[in-house]
A protein has these predicted regions:
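Acidic, surface-exposed loops and disordered segments
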Residues: 1-167
Length: 167
């Protein structure tokens, strides 16, 4: 449970490359996420080419930290799933699993949503020549945190948001 409480959005990274086995464990964690009807609607693009990461930062005004990251991942939503109304929930669980595994590996991440933003979808679709069978869901910047205690605990618990048996 400590990993859940240590996860923070990290936007400053060292230049240290991420070991392939850590990337593999993050992807494995993502793919262990629950999904409606076990549809597993995810695919991933792993980007470690610096030039590509720098260009990727243009997909959103909120992606300014990307050029400083040694690794980026694009989480893709497979189309034509059995339970399409639930794919966003499935993908959210996969992204959270990936980010929690990153913390366990000593890494920091930040999640940049694509959502249903047509400009962001078009940018990523064109840049990565995505087929119609997938849509971009999220972009993650990943790296070793440049600041000490970047994944420090901040208590966000708010008892006023908890309701028992009725609202």
């Amino acid at each position: 449970m400590d990993i859940i409480f240590e996860r923070r959005s990290v936007r400053k990274y060292t230049e240290q490359k991420i070991e392939p086995e850590k990337i593999d464990r993050m992807l494995r964690a993502a793919m262990q996420a629950p999904s409606a009807t076990n549809q597993q609607p995810w695919e991933f693009i792993v980007i470690d080419d610096k030039e590509t990461i720098v260009k990727l930062a243009d997909f959103s005004q909120y992606a300014k930290m990307l050029p400083g990251a040694p690794l980026a991942m694009i989480v893709l939503e497979k189309q034509g799933m059995r339970a399409p109304r639930f794919t966003e929930q499935d993908l959210g669980a996969a992204v959270q699993n990936l980010m929690l595994q990153a913390v366990k590996e000593g890494l920091g991440t930040v999640w940049m949503g694509v959502g249903r933003n047509s400009e962001r979808e078009a940018f990523l679709t064109e840049m990565f020549n995505l087929p119609e069978t997938v849509k971009p869901f999220a972009v993650l910047a990943i790296g070793y945190p440049a600041e000490e205690n970047a994944n420090r605990f901040v208590d966000r618990y708010d008892e006023t948001r908890v309701h028992y048996n009725k609202y």
